[in-house]
Each structure stands twice: as structure tokens, then as C-alpha cells.
Amino acid sequence: MAKTETPTSDLVRTYLREIGRVPLLTHEEEVVLGKRVQQWMKLQELRQTLQSEEGDRDPSDLEWAAAAGLSIEELRQQQHLGEQAKRKMIEANLRLVVSVAKKYLKRNMDLLDLIQEGTIGMQRGVEKFDPTKGYRFSTYAYWWIRQAITRAIAEKARTIRLPIHITEKLNKIKKMQRQLSQQLGRTATLPELAAALDLTPAQVRDYLEKARHPLSLDLRVGDNQDTELGDLLETDCTTPEEFTLQASMRRDIDRLLDQLTEQQRQVIALRYGLEDGQVMTLASIGDRLQISRERVRQLEREALHTLRQARSQVQEYLAS
């Protein structure tokens, strides 16, 4: 019997086909687009500062431009370039969102919902990305995508333990948050969210507070209740910068080790615990590789000589 396709699987297939047509960005393109986004974000921050100084009154474009030292035309040009750059960076990396989302399937959420949450996380990553740091955007964005998805899973686990009428209201609030985020290109404020839902800001705040009661990290989630919530949320990297630095360092170390012969690489990995954190003696390595202790020493010496010559590739990590 032929397998019946569901509407959801059709939507996913169509979505994947569409995003697959968007070309990936080169590192040089990421730098150019990233700088445009950062210029636009600084103008946005300036606007928020002016707004708070004026008692939440929205500054006019003329006031905004004057505070930025720009003409109205220059301000609008910066806005156009910034929003266009942000859109390009998001669209070129949607395949990464799908890749991360697939790792969290069977966690009480559909793939499309996971993709949507991951995309919102990536939008935040685009806004925070500093292209002058030298790393690729995809490495940096991975942290933001994963954080958004795991938080969404935690929220879902939390809301299914609330009364149904509160859960329904929270679902509406979440849906409107997504819509406004896509329309505005940023996270909606509480008053904007309340107005769109025909609620008062106090009511929206109250519903959101109800969804924030503590959850045990031992809580089991997933279709088969086979994963603890803490397993999804725990990470050794507390910031996207730390995650990116570690990922970049691993990649550069792997590239460095690729300059060694297979046997040299094995010796270094075992001698310094690169595989499992357990260092081994020369004799133990010799037994493992079925070569003499002296041959192990020779391979180690040759490998270290090669690595010292190429250490400039990881010098920045050693300095930091």
C-alpha cells in the first residue's frame, strides 16, 4: 500500500524546495551584509533611546535623522539597506534552521513549529552578529537557533500542565508574537502585542507570568517520554560568542591535525586525550597500534615538530 502523504509533509517538502533555491553566502558577502545590519541596529537603538527620553513618545524621522547626524534620505537609505541585508542573511541560512530543527523532532512539537521557532532565533542572531570578529555567521547562528528551539520545547512542556483556557490564550499570544515579529522585523513590545490581541498590557503580562512557573529539569518530554528537559537545555557554552569560539577552535585544530600522517594523528590523539580526555603512555599507545614504544616516541616528535611550525593557525586561541 502506498504511503499517504499528510498536508504537513507536503508543506515541509514545498518549504524545503523553496529555500533550497536560495544560494549560500560567501564569507565576504556575510561581512558586507552583517555590517549593514549592524549600522541599522545602531540606528534602531538610537531611536529607542530618543523614545525613552521623550516619555515613550515616538520621535519623528526628522528628529531621529538629526540625532544620528544624517539627512532624511540617508536615514531611509540605511533602513532599506539594513532590512534588505537582514532578509538576505536569514533567507540564505534557512537550511541551517531546518538542519537544527530536525535534531529535535519527537519533542512534542511539529517540524514546521520547530522551524518557525528556529527562524525567530536566527533573526536574533542576525541582529547580534558582529562581522568584524572573523567567524562564519552559520557557526554563530547555530547557538541562537538551538536556544530558540529548546526554549520553545520547554515552554510547550510547561503550558501542557496549565488549565486549557490559559493554554489556548497563551497559544494565541505566541502566534501573534510570531506574526508581529515577521511584520516588524523585530520583537513586538508588550503594548503592541496587547493591542493586536485586543487585551490590556497587564492582561498579556499576567498570562505570560502564569506560563513561567518553574519546571523540573528531570521532566521527561517527547513522544516516548525518552528525553529529560535538562538534556535539551544544558550546554557548556553560556554565550553565542563562547560557542562560536569553541566551534572555530575545534575546526582549526582538526585542520591542523590534517597536516599529520594518519599514524601521527593517532599518536597525538591518544597521547594527549583528544578523543576521550584520557591520556596514554607511550607503551600503551604502542600496544594499541601494535608498534614499538620507540616508534611511538618518534611519531610524536615528528608530529609535534609539524604542529609547532603551523601553530600560527591556533595562536589567537592560545593568546586568549
UniProtKB/Swiss-Prot annotation:
- Ranges in coiled-coil conformation: none
Key words, A-Z:
Cytoplasm, DNA-binding, Sigma factor, Transcription, Transcription regulation
Which positions does the motif Interaction with polymerase core subunit RpoC occupy?
Answer: 113-116
> Which CDD domains has this protein been placed in?
Sigma70_r4 (cd06171)
Q: Where in the cell is it found?
A: Cytoplasm
Q: Where is this region: Sigma-70 factor domain-4?
A: 256-310
DNA-binding region of this protein: 282-301
Task: Give the span(s) annotated as Sigma-70 factor domain-2.
Answer: 89-159
Instruction: Report residue spans for region: Sigma-70 factor domain-3.
Output: 168-243
Q: Which Pfam families match?
A: Sigma70_r1_2, Sigma70_r2, Sigma70_r3, Sigma70_r4
Task: Extract the GO molecular function terms from the UniProt entry.
Answer: DNA binding; sigma factor activity
Q: Does the keyword DNA-binding apply?
A: yes
Q: Which GO terms describe its biological process?
A: DNA-templated transcription initiation
What GO cellular-component annotations does this UniProt entry give?
cytoplasm
Report the family membership. Belongs to the sigma-70 factor family.
Q: What does this protein do?
A: Sigma factors are initiation factors that promote the attachment of RNA polymerase to specific initiation sites and are then released.
Q: What is this protein called?
A: RNA polymerase sigma factor SigA3
- Give the organism the record lists: Synechococcus elongatus (strain ATCC 33912 / PCC 7942 / FACHB-805)
